[in-house]
């Protein structure tokens, strides 16, 4: 989230994407060189078929984490924990439905993400929440998100809106510096 539109972008053909076996080989070859952590990111890693099987393939002495938008977390949290995932970071920029849907360009609701976070906690996963704060969009969400997770073991991090090229409509005026 949000939906990104990449006109005229040449995506890799499926056969050019590394298989889980190839990714595991790369990870295993880096462990003797000091690799201690692996983070699965996206797009959305929970859209990847059989992601739990991939996690099981990774050396279990690693700290294995995932960053997700949280929309599928309720469905997969238990299996993720059983497969060896240690931590999950959930992107959540608002908990009021209007801001959540506008910022994410989605019809989904923040309640879906909040249920996923709670399911992940109950499954034994360590949970962090990242909230990207944008002036004129969701600065009012800082207090609401803080209140929602105060007194829980969920770590909340507020992040500056960053320039990542031409895909997110970044403007300096939307940055609230930390």
What is each of the regions a protein language model found here?
Residues 7-8, 48-49, 74, 165-166:
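Short, solvent-exposed loop/turn segments at secondary-structure junctions
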Residues 44:
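Conserved G/P- and acidic residue-centered "switch" motifs that form tight phosphate/ATP-binding loops
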Residues 1-18:
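Canonical Radical SAM [4Fe-4S] cluster-binding loop centered on the CxxxCxxC motif
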């Amino acid at each position: 989230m949000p939906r990104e539109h990449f006109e005229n972008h040449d995506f890799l053909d499926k056969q050019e994407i590394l298989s889980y076996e190839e990714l595991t080989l790369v990870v295993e070859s880096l462990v003797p060189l000091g690799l201690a952590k692996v983070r699965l990111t996206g797009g959305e890693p929970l859209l990847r078929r059989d992601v739990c099987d991939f996690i099981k393939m990774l050396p279990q002495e690693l700290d294995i984490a995932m960053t997700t938008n949280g929309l599928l977390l309720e469905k997969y949290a238990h299996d993720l924990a059983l497969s060896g995932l240690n931590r999950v970071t959930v992107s959540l920029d608002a908990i009021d439905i209007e801001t959540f849907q506008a910022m994410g360009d989605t019809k989904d609701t923040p309640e879906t993400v909040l249920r996923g976070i709670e399911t992940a906690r109950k499954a034994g996963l360590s949970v962090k929440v990242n909230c990207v704060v944008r002036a004129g969009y969701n600065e009012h969400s800082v207090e609401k998100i803080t209140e929602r997770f105060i007194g829980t073991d969920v770590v909340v991090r507020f992040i500056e809106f960053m320039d990542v090229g031409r895909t997110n409509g970044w403007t300096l005026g939307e940055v609230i510096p930390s």
